[in-house]
């Protein structure tokens, strides 16, 4: 991308947009952070060439996956790009690749390990690249929730549906209890399937995707949904509330999409007459209701590809992707702006930078396996069961 082609979005920086880097541990997940002493300097002018050389040396032994929310400096080295589930499936379709370098976050690398063969090794360039939403539901908390459902006498009626953006432990719990996984693209089908299996759904960890899908796609009311807070006894709900609910939503959210507000939508409509507002279903219900279009990252990309020249769009999703789309479609006369006025990067996605990628590729090229993500066999078996149920959805 040349400087002349680059489109700058009108956003203001905020100190809350990016977490401080270089901690010894992720404060939420307590995952260790590997900061090797030989990590290249970000100012090294040869970083791009070093990454290219190491990748060339590895050849078909390495397959680099790049999530849509990654930095441009990283995404340029991805063999494929996409959302988390697409990337995991792409990895499984490349059995000749000994190393899968996942430029994404921890739960994505876990999913890739679950779906790839035992001979393949999944690597995450920075072990602290977690997901705050995935970390909002731990195995212990979900087990306590199931106990509350059992005490309310409804556990046998409940089918768990877990978002792809969850840990391997939560996917395994879901598989063990007869549930399925969903993505933002197939959440409607997953919920329809779940309600064919039982009378109620426990949806975790993203309350907004669960609520939006139930209300927009299945015709439920907000009153059909209750919010389970894992930090309160019995989730802060009475047994009667649990028995009356159709959707039991986990109190989790995406820190990026949760920033978009109704005020953001109103403001952009005032600033840009005729703008189309397109948001991700992880946004709050009132934001989704005020938008013109709602869909996954893949949906957003396809919608902009099909949009007519001269159309105007305000996008409510992660800023790296929005910037990339704005630059891509600017030559076609499509005006694309970020929905919010402040920077809204995914802070953990941004931990994967070019120095970490270079260090990873050079280490692998030298025969040193670093930052491997490996799911234990029992967890893998139940998590894979839940994923296979999703793959079998019509």
Give the location of each predicted region.
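Active-site loop-to-helix "anion-binding N-cap" substructures in soluble metabolic enzymes
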Residues: 2-316, 320-394
């Amino acid at each position: 991308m040349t400087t002349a082609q680059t489109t700058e979005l009108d956003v203001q920086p905020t100190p809350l947009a990016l977490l401080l880097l270089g901690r010894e541990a992720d404060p939420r997940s307590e995952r260790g952070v590997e900061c090797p002493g030989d990590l290249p300097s970000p100012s090294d002018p040869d970083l791009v060439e070093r990454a290219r050389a190491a990748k060339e040396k590895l050849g078909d032994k390495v397959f680099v996956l790049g999530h849509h929310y990654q930095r441009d400096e990283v995404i340029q080295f991805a063999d494929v790009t996409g959302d988390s589930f697409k990337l995991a499936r792409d990895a499984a379709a490349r059995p000749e690749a000994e190393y899968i370098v996942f430029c994404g976050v921890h739960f994505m690398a876990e999913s890739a390990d679950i779906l790839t063969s035992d001979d393949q090794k999944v690597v995450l360039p920075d072990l602290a690249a977690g997901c705050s939403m995935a970390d909002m539901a731990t195995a212990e908390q979900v087990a306590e929730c199931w106990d509350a459902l059992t005490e309310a006498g409804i556990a046998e009626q409940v089918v768990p549906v877990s978002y792809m953006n969850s840990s391997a432990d939560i996917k395994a719990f879901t598989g063990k209890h007869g549930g399925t996984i969903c993505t933002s693209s197939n959440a409607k089908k997953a919920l329809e399937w779940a309600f064919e299996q039982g009378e109620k759904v426990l949806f975790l960890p993203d309350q907004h995707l669960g609520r939006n899908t139930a209300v927009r796609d299945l015709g439920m009311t907000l009153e059909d949904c209750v919010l389970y807070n894992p930090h309160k006894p019995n989730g802060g709900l009475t047994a009667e509330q649990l028995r009356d609910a159709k959707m039991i939503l986990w109190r989790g959210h995406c820190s990026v999409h949760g920033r978009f507000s109704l005020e953001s939508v109103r403001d952009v409509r005032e600033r840009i007459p005729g703008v189309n507002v397109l948001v991700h279903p992880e946004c709050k219900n009132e934001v989704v209701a005020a938008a013109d279009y709602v869909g996954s990252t893949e949906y957003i990309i396809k919608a902009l590809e099909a949009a007519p020249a001269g159309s105007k769009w305000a996008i409510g999703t992660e800023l790296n992707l929005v910037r990339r789309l704005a630059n891509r479609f600017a030559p076609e006369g499509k005006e694309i702006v970020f929905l919010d006025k402040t920077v809204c990067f995914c802070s953990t996605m941004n931990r994967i930078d070019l120095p970490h990628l270079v260090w990873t590729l050079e280490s692998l090229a030298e025969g040193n396996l670093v930052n491997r993500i490996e799911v234990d066999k029992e967890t893998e078996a139940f998590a894979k069961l839940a994923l296979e149920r999703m793959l079998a959805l019509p």
